[in-house]
Amino acid sequence: MLQSEDIDGQCINCHHYRNYKTDNMQFHVRQLKGGTIIVNGDEVKKINLKTDSTISAGVYPAWHPTHNFIAYSINDTGQSFHTKNNNKIEVQDLKSDLILYDIDRNEVSFIEHDTLEWEVFPAWAPDGKTLYYNSAHYEIQN
């Protein structure tokens, strides 16, 4: 078991499991020692999904139900803090795309990459044949 105290209290979030089992899972560690931890059977590795051509590292994950793939949205996010309730924080995406991480090959490829579309929240169909996600058209009007 990993606890945030093991990594100096840093944020651990966005846990995701293949088929709700702990044999295959992933989670993100944020800040200085950040990265994505992938558990694939007995193998545990830390990866960085940020490349020169991506907006960010992986954000919102979705394990393929049968293959060693994880779809991620990659997002440029911002936070808004409420003045009336200091504990309430809103997060919004400023940009987003979708990538596919091939665990066996350690390769990242784009699923969607369009500056006028925001793609987020990937989810595989139970049979793994279809990847669903939210998409919103974004264009600044003059």
Place the predicted regions along the sequence by residue.
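Short, conserved, GDST-rich strand-edge loop motifs in beta-rich repeat architectures
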Residues: 72-93, 134-142
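Residue-level detector of Asp-centered blade-edge/turn motifs that repeat once per structural unit
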Residues: 19-21, 65-66, 126-127
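Conserved beta-strand position repeated once per blade in WD40 beta-propeller domains
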Residues: 14-17, 60-62, 121-123
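Residue position within the beta-strands of beta-propeller blades
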Residues: 24-28, 69-73, 130-134
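Preference for long, solvent-exposed alpha-helical segments and helix-linker "stalks"
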Residues: 1-35
